[in-house]
Amino acid sequence: MAPVPTHLRRIAAAAAVVALLDTANAAPYASPHGGHGVSLAAAEDLPRRIISLVPATTEMLFAMGAGDRIAGVSNYDRFPPETARLPKVGGLLDPDVERLLSLKPDLVIVYDTQADLKRQLERAQVPMFPYAHRGLADITETMRALGVRVGAKTAADAAAARVEQQLAAIGRRVAGRPRPKTLLVFGRELGALRRVTASGGYGFLHDVLELAGGADVLGDLRKQSVDMSAEMILARAPEVIIELHYGDAVKPENFDAERRVWDALPSVPAVRNKRVHLLDGSEFVVPGPRIVLAAERFARTLHPEVGRK
């Protein structure tokens, strides 16, 4: 089979992020230490072989000390490094049901939109934890609910509280500063201003941008993703453009070339004032404990005068 062109891989990656967003409407990751708080379920009923089809919940399980009970993960899990050795069972759009069932799970974390998979798991009498993500606050809410479900309530509550405290600290550092109008782009055809997809005024990306001291230039549109034309970008006149990259579609040495693509719109304030920023990292598209790192990087990009604390 011929290799897939890079620009098509980029489009596919952006489509996957849009699919993730559509499932709902300061420090890097650190695993907690200590024991597990047992939920109301009896200890013998707690899941011992968990399969997570959601990278965010995989990271949550590790954060609450339940990573040793994960029996399988999605093809898209990359963090923490321990996921590399775990069996892969497909993803949001292409779950491998046969492979999944062969691992004999006693709990499967699924996207709530995976209706066909949920029906098959129901027929197989496999317990499920449906996942639907919306805004920033849902990250810690999901962590706490998942902790109860797997019998790690105490550790999950502690991990969630740390995330909330770290996010609040970032918010305090940028409070009272001017909030630049920001366009947050998470999809674009490489080498051209085509197929531009940006964060609208709803969802965790919007929430993190606002917490980090930016004013979402599409904040009035209650959508998680917005397809942008050049005319729309010109009309919105963002003062800052942040473009997210993830995976291997763009090498760091090519960032300058991709940044120059925006020179096609010289009248846009962000372009004119050289405030187009390309950021790379899965923490921007995996709404789990590392969302703190995403918020930190947004804050330093939007407000470089504010040091990391």
Describe the residue ranges of each PLM region.
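Bacterial N-terminal signal peptides that target proteins for export
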Residues: 2-13
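Bacterial N-terminal signal peptides
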Residues: 12-23
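Boundary at the C-terminal end of the N-terminal hydrophobic targeting segment
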Residues: 24-30, 41-43
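Short helix-initiation/N-cap motifs at beta->coil->alpha
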Residues: 35-37, 89-98, 221-230
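Extracytoplasmic substrate-binding proteins
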Residues: 44-49, 116-193, 218-220, 271-309
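A short, structured surface patch at a secondary-structure boundary
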Residues: 48-103, 107-117, 217, 265
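Short helices/loops that flank or line small-molecule/ion binding pockets
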Residues: 97-104, 124, 228-237
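His/Asp/Glu-enriched short active-site or ligand-binding loop at hydrolase and phosphoryl-transfer sites
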Residues: 199-225, 243-245
